[in-house]
Design a protein with these regions (language model features):
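Hydrophobic alpha-helical transmembrane segments of multi-pass integral membrane proteins
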Residues: 20-24, 64, 106-110, 153-154, ...
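Hydrophobic alpha-helical transmembrane segments of membrane transport/permease proteins
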Residues: 18-69, 162-183
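An internal, D/E-rich "acidic patch" concept
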Residues: 1, 61-117
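Membrane-water interface segments at the C-terminal ends of transmembrane alpha-helices
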Residues: 25-32, 62, 70-73, 137-168, ...
Length: 318
């Protein structure tokens, strides 16, 4: 087996092991929650016999290990269980909401990634001058403010005062693309501000590191202007760390939209999760947690693979 194949196999195996461990944490965390699931479903007036029958039906009395493996094997086959509060199949209920979350994350990435790279290039071009300092200050301020606060501030000024975009990001299948984009404009703006600083600063740092190379000095001696040196010579050789940090932020965009979906009442997985946490709907919480973990770990694994394939130094064991 070649070193690169072995390294890729190790990354994939570690990701699967991590997902398995997180599934244990998710399951254990939900079963130790206080309260009685049967009582919350049937209400305070339920008889002891009715409560006992429902507990037996839900498998609450089964050993935790048996319940865990039944849940895990079901999830591996696409069976995420049934919502306790509505009786609806969880996989079916999550299908449209999952795509809504991906839709929001995708368009946030479409805006954030090119903007972060452009600002990073601009900061390098004007290193230690006022554009560089201004970009760094604004992006650091955006990452320092809680995202829900940014959401409410934008909602107040842009949606309520200026009435440019709706304050509630409601989308449905009957809406056209531009209608949906208009509806999610504010959530996209908030998510962009949240992830912009990390990607911009990584772009800046990666390019500045490459600018110390000898071939950059050679390019400057050829008479190329500063922008040509940065864009044509430094930027292509700094792609690997930039792609890595972009993938990590894409993972955050998918998993970290929970707060934004709640703020803007967006019909995604985050909103669905919060609604059912308040109802103590354990199967829904477990399913959403497992999906979020799988997406996050999967995108991080892709980031590792891209870093390995794009950097020859990582292809060989140390």
């Amino acid at each position: 087996m070649s070193p690169i194949v072995k390294l890729l196999a190790q990354r994939i195996a570690l990701s699967l092991l991590l997902l398995l461990l997180i599934s244990v944490v998710i399951f254990a965390g939900t079963i130790v929650l206080p309260g009685d699931v049967a009582q919350s479903i049937l209400g305070q007036s339920a008889t002891p016999e009715a409560l006992a029958n429902l507990r037996a039906e839900l498998g609450v009395n089964d050993p935790p290990v048996q319940r865990y493996f039944a849940w895990l094997f079901g999830a591996m086959q696409g069976d995420l269980g049934t919502a306790l509060t509505s009786g609806q199949d969880i996989a079916q209920a999550l299908s449209s909401r999952f795509w809504n979350t991906l839709f929001l994350a995708f368009w946030a990435a479409v805006v954030a990634v090119p903007l972060a790279i452009f600002l990073g290039l601009l900061a390098v071009r004007f290193k230690d001058r006022w554009p560089d300092k201004l970009i760094s200050a604004v992006t650091l301020a955006s990452i320092s403010i809680p995202e829900f606060l940014i959401g409410y501030v934008l909602m107040y000024f842009i949606a309520v005062k200026l009435r440019w975009f709706p304050s509630v990001a409601m989308v449905n299948d009957n809406m056209g693309l531009f209608e949906k984009l208009n509806a999610i404009a504010l959530p996209i703006a908030v998510l962009t501000l949240v992830v912009l600083a990390h990607m911009m600063r990584m772009t800046r740092a990666a390019i500045l590191n490459v600018m110390q190379s000898a071939y950059i000095e050679t390019a400057e001696l050829k008479g190329l202007n500063a922008f040509q040196v940065i864009y044509r010579h430094a930027f292509p050789n700094a792609i690997a760390p930039i792609v890595n940090v972009v993938m990590l932020n894409l993972a955050y965009l998918v998993v970290g939209v929970v707060v934004i979906e709640v703020v803007f009442v967006y019909p995604g997985m985050g909103q669905y999760l919060v609604d059912h946490v308040s109802k103590r709907d354990v199967p829904v919480v477990q399913a959403c947690g497992l999906i979020f973990a799988a997406v996050y770990i999967g995108l991080n694994m892709i980031a590792d693979i891209v870093a390995i394939l794009s950097n020859p130094r990582l292809r060989h064991p140390k």
